[in-house]
């Protein structure tokens, strides 16, 4: 079957500009809805709705601390999260899985603790829970300990060809530390 035949499927929606039928078409950035009277009418819109976080399930008995309405499980562009049913009037959200908090204190501010976070690209890193006041972050697993060379109060764990090794977390030092 030809690609053009796949993407001229009728949708039974009418064009808001001219009243003709909308059809699913294929474009450079993926499928979209376009007017069947193209090029006379140039109406197009994305096939997927741009609403961030459609409702998956209503969580009965769970109330929003901000407005008192029910909380719902939503699917967003970064995965599942819990949010208020009154979105966008109430923007309260919660993470389903809380970040792993370590007992290791932040070596930069010495008051916060290091927590595991995930970047927008899916990479795991550890940073201070006092962000944005403290902007300490490392890409490797933090280990409690002190560097014998520079006395930096944090070590990191790296997986090398020789196995798992510990290194100083200081960017100025970075020397390997023997496992004691």
Curated annotation (Swiss-Prot):
**One GO MF term, please?**
DNA topoisomerase type I (single strand cut, ATP-independent) activity
List the GO terms this entry assigns under cellular component, sorted alphabetically: chromosome
* Gene3D superfamilies hit by this protein: Bacterial Topoisomerase I, domain 1 (3.30.65.10)
Top-level taxon of origin:
Bacteria
Q: Which InterPro entries match?
A: Topo_IA, Topo_IA_Znf
Q: Which GO terms describe its biological process?
A: DNA topological change
Q: What family does the Swiss-Prot or TrEMBL record give for this protein?
A: To H.influenzae HI_0656.1.
Q: What is this protein called?
A: Uncharacterized protein YrdD
Classification from the root reads: Bacteria, Pseudomonadati, Pseudomonadota, Gammaproteobacteria, Enterobacterales
């Amino acid at each position: 079957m030809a690609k053009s035949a796949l993407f001229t499927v009728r949708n039974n929606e009418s064009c808001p500009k001219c009243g003709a039928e909308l059809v699913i078409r294929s474009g450079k950035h993926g499928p979209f809805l376009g007017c069947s009277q193209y090029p006379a009418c140039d109406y197009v819109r994305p096939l997927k709705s741009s609403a961030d976080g459609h409702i998956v399930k209503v969580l009965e008995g769970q109330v929003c601390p901000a407005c008192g309405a029910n909380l719902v499980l939503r699917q967003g562009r970064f995965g599942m999260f819990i949010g208020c049913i009154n979105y966008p009037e109430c923007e309260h959200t919660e993470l389903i899985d809380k970040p792993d908090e370590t007992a290791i204190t932040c070596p930069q501010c010495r008051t916060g603790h290091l927590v595991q976070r995930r970047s927008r690209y899916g990479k795991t890193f550890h940073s201070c829970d006092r962000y944005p006041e403290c902007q300490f972050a490392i890409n490797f697993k933090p280990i409690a300990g002190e560097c014998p060379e520079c006395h930096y109060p944090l070590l990191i764990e790296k997986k090398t060809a020789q196995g798992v090794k510990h290194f100083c977390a200081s960017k100025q030092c970075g020397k390997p530390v023997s496992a004691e």
